[in-house]
């Protein structure tokens, strides 16, 4: 959010200095090469992963995809747009050539608008997915009637509409301007940068609201919902016997990992409270045990990933906004200069690793993803459909939408 120079400019009118020195810009060659390699890797992996995720969802549209497909498509499009627009512009104008800004005033405003739009769309989609998952796990009966694909589509559309509105101010406060003037008082063309156009006070208010709405509140909501989901999963497993009798209506602890098992547990619990008796036998399913363990780990990993990737980015924005002009010493400039590139790299990493989270959350999506990879790699295996009565999906598949029973799809 600063300038096309990756640190606050210190323009000097001394004509005896080089333009680098007058604008306060100096990026070492080793840093340019290093961050170019990192950006190229992130761009390649992230663009391929998000494009393939969107491909999987669209191909599976009439088959196995459930509610998760809308969230996956939303996140994939946001990540793909951010990487395709953000990384090339940043490499050219923020890493290699800090000035002059060559994309014009509209390009400056559009770049920051798209950047902010994708950030909002990502966090709102993650929060919406966490809310659906929490409801599906904690209130499965209600979730069956409420969490339809049609309503999920409206939820995703609403999140993008909100993102458009929240990102629009960025196109107003950013713009192109010249940092230096010639001896005749005319703007110096070579000093053209993409930077903030509003006062420091207005910028402080904007950044505070932006950090709160685009990071703190969505992350807090996601952490809370995922915490409730994890607690409910663990509580259910502690309440249910680990074994069940053949022919008995008593669900085993392992059977809770499917939606059918979760619903039967509710019926069984009511019967048991009214005096029903159960007898137990040994029952094992190692794969489902591991599925539950993985589901709990993934819920926690989602929050941790966004904290690691986004917290430094927003901390750096606050630093730019609140450090007074007279406090920018040379060591602080140098720190900010490279901190800028590190935080933006982490920000783009979050878009690149998002497809990995899809694969970790849903075993059904993972199978579709691997089939698509195999097909694109030349094995030409078609994306096969599962039979009408597949193996019971894991609870995380049910909660996220893949593996929905046919009657719940609309």
UniProtKB/Swiss-Prot annotation:
Residues 56-64, 132-154, 238-297, 359-410 are cytoplasmic. Keywords: Cell membrane, Disulfide bond, G-protein coupled receptor, Lipoprotein, Membrane, Palmitate, Receptor, Transducer, Transmembrane, Transmembrane helix. Expressed in prostate (at protein level). Disulfide bonds join 108-194. A lipid is attached at residue 377 (S-palmitoyl cysteine). The keyword Metal-binding does not apply. The chain crosses the membrane at residues 33-55, 65-87, 110-131, 155-176, 218-237, 298-318, 338-358. It is a multi-pass membrane protein. Belongs to the G-protein coupled receptor 1 family. Neurotensin receptor subfamily. NTSR2 sub-subfamily. PANTHER family: G-PROTEIN COUPLED RECEPTOR, NEUROTENSIN RECEPTOR TYPE 2. This is Neurotensin receptor type 2. It comes from Homo sapiens (Human).
């Amino acid at each position: 959010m600063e300038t096309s120079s990756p640190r606050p400019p210190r323009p000097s009118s001394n004509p005896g200095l080089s333009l680098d020195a007058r604008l306060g810009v100096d990026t070492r060659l080793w840093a340019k090469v290093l961050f170019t390699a990192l950006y190229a890797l992130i761009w390649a992996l992230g663009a391929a992963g998000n494009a393939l995720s969107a491909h999987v969802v669209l191909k599976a549209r009439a088959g196995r995809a459930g509610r998760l497909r809308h969230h996956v498509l939303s996140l994939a499009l946001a990540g793909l747009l951010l990487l395709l627009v953000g990384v090339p512009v940043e490499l050219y104008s923020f890493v290699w050539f800090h000035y002059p800004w060559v994309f014009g005033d509209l390009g400056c405003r559009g770049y920051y608008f798209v950047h902010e739009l994708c950030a909002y769309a990502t966090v709102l989609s993650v929060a919406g997915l966490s809310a659906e998952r929490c409801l599906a796990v904690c209130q499965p009966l209600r979730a069956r009637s409420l969490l339809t694909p049609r309503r999920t589509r409206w939820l995703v559309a609403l999140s993008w509409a909100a993102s458009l509105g929240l990102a629009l101010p960025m196109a107003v406060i950013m713009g192109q301007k010249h940092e230096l003037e010639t001896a005749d008082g005319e703007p110096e063309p070579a000093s053209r940068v993409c930077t903030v156009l509003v006062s420091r006070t207005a910028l402080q208010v904007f950044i505070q609201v932006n950090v709160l709405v685009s990071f703190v509140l969505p992350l807090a909501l996601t952490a809370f919902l995922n915490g409730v989901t994890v607690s409910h999963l663990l509580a259910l497993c502690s309440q249910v016997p680990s074994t069940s009798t053949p022919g008995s209506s008593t669900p085993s602890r392992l059977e809770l990992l499917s939606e059918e098992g979760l619903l039967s547990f509710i019926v069984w619990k009511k019967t048991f409270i009214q005096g029903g008796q159960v007898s137990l036998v040994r029952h094992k399913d190692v794969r489902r045990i591991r599925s539950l363990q993985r589901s709990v780990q993934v819920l926690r990993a989602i929050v941790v990933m966004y904290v690691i990737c986004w917290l430094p980015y927003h901390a750096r924005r606050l630093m730019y906004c609140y450090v007074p002009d007279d406090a920018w010493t040379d060591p602080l400039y140098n720190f900010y200069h490279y901190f800028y590139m590190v935080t933006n790299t982490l920000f783009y990493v979050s878009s690149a690793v998002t497809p990995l989270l899809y694969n970790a959350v849903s075993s059904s999506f993972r199978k579709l993803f691997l089939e698509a990879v195999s097909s694109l790699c030349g094995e030409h295996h078609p994306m096969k459909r599962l039979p009408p009565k597949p193996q019971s999906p894991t609870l995380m598949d049910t909660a996220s939408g893949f593996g929905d029973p046919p009657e719940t799809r609309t």
